[in-house]
Regions:
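The catalytic Nudix box helix
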Residues: 31-66
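Short loop/turn segments immediately following the C-termini of beta-strands
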Residues: 23
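Conserved hydrophobic "DFG−1" position in protein kinase catalytic cores
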Residues: 11-12, 20, 88, 105
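Active-site-adjacent beta-strand/loop module that shapes the phosphate/pyrophosphate-binding cleft
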Residues: 69-95, 127
Length: 147
């Protein structure tokens, strides 16, 4: 199986919501980010992609590493993605640019929509919340905290 390497940024609002984007010609929402250019490391790619996709200028030292995760690619059937993910407070003004067709704020503690990229739904959100997807499903189903 082919592997695609990407960088992404969790932009979190003061209320805990995180920004998701949908790229033109796709149906899945994901984090802002993308593939590094030749010679570019994960951090530099994350900064560049946020500037290109959202018009926001982040500095490398302002990003905090969440982790590196591997799962099925959202828009490339038969591929896996390895994503290095960073976090940053959401800037006040973000607007779709470049290939971004739509922005959507997401409450990661609530029920997750079905149109999220696997990297975001299966790996990143559980990592930032500190619990597994299975544990979240149990909580949502029972309406109570896990034991």
């Amino acid at each position: 199986m082919s592997v695609i390497t990407v960088s992404g940024v969790v932009l979190r609002a003061d209320d805990g919501a995180l920004l998701t984007v949908r790229k033109r010609g796709t149906s899945r929402f994901m984090l802002p980010g993308g593939k590094p250019e030749p010679g570019e490391d994960a951090l530099a790619a994350a900064v560049r992609e946020c500037r290109e996709e959202l018009g926001v200028d982040l500095t490398p030292e302002s990003l905090e590493l969440v982790g590196t995760f591997r799962t099925a690619a959202a828009n490339e059937p038969g591929h896996e993605v390895i994503g290095t993910i960073f976090t940053h407070a959401a800037p006040p003004d973000v607007a779709p640019a470049a290939e971004i067709a739509e922005l959507r704020w997401l409450d990661p503690t609530g029920p997750l929509p079905d149109d999220l990229a696997p990297l975001l739904a299966e790996r990143v959100i559980p990592a930032i919340l500190g619990r597994s997807t299975v544990e979240r499903a149990r909580v949502a189903h029972r309406g109570s905290s896990p034991i």
